[in-house]
Amino acid sequence: MAIENKLMKEYQYHIFSPYRVCPLGAHVDHQHGLVTGFAIDKGVDLWFDVCEDSHVHLESKTFEGVVDFEIDAPSQVRERHWGDYARGAKFALRKRFELKRGITGVIQGSLPVGGLSSSAAVLIAYVMAFAKANDITLQPFEVVKIASEAEREYIGLNNGLLDQACIALGKKDGLLFLDCDSNDWRIIKRNPEMPEFEIGIFFSGLTRSLVNSDYNLRVYECKTAAWNMLAYTDQPLKTFDKTFLRDIPKATFDKTRIAMPARFARRAEHFYSEYRRVRQGVTAWETGNLKLFGKLSFDSCESSIHNYECGSPELIAIYEIMRQLPGVYGGRFSGAGFKGACIALVDPAYKDDIEKVLTEKYLAQFPEYEKTFQVFWVKPDDGARFV
């Protein structure tokens, strides 16, 4: 807090860009599916001043080194360094706007945890800061699209809109529901009859980089499944980048799944079953049925393990432990499910017992993570904003 107070005095502007959790709608945004999510009350803080010239100078309280570049120059080749996210934000903004003024600032993350879309939170903070410095007014969904494009085209992660939408559009009193095909979205307010809950984040101790994981491979497998269905039914093939499972009716999948390689059939099965779970989950949320909503989140994780085939031994162990604990309504892997964390919706009265038992059982299986396994408790919050 002392560091934050000092930075607030030192810099004119402060952006808070929250992390996000997705209880339902995992691994389907890149196929134009339906997703849900929350922004949470932990995230990334960016303090900055606007420069009179085009120079960008950034420091991090989380990572070593400094970042320096010119905002009006073409983006250089990605350096696989934390500064790539600032360069990616510049890259996507310069495709739309003229950028003349840079910033001087400091960025800091509040949780050392993978699986909460910290990269998307950082990108959104930079997009908002560079827009502010150059007197560019962006609507929240414009921020979503620009940040997603930066991560996809510059960072190299073939994501959809889920992460950025939760971070930019989230509200503390409701659940984000987004159709990644039409980009229609709404906040579904909490039903007054819904029980109280908090969100547990159970960090496995493993860190990860999605660019170097099987994340992109899974995206290609989903598209290949879609191509298989089009080919087996003699429909015209689209280019790979324009091929999405959302465009193919489930009835077509039911007819063709036996003919396609099992791997691709499993990826498609996850997509279509997750579509159904999100629909059911939205109804459960609207009616205040947190027990059903939680069960659907558990079922989503089962499909992620067996159909989408993600999840490290560590994450699967956390999931299997928390599924048996009293007070856990539901939960799943957070993010892509390659290392990182699990999230759970829990009854606050059981928090202490859940943390104690889960920690004991997990470390009994994986004692090597005794110093890095962590449990955090968070709540839904509003999306990215100037503080």
Q: PLM ranges: what are they?
A:
Residues H32-A39, R218-V219:
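Short Gly/aromatic-enriched secondary-structure transition segments
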Residues G37-F38, W47-V50, F97:
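Short, charge-rich binding segments
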Residues M1-L34, D68-A73, E79-M194, Q324, ...:
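Gly/Ser-rich oxyanion-binding loop with an adjacent helix/lid
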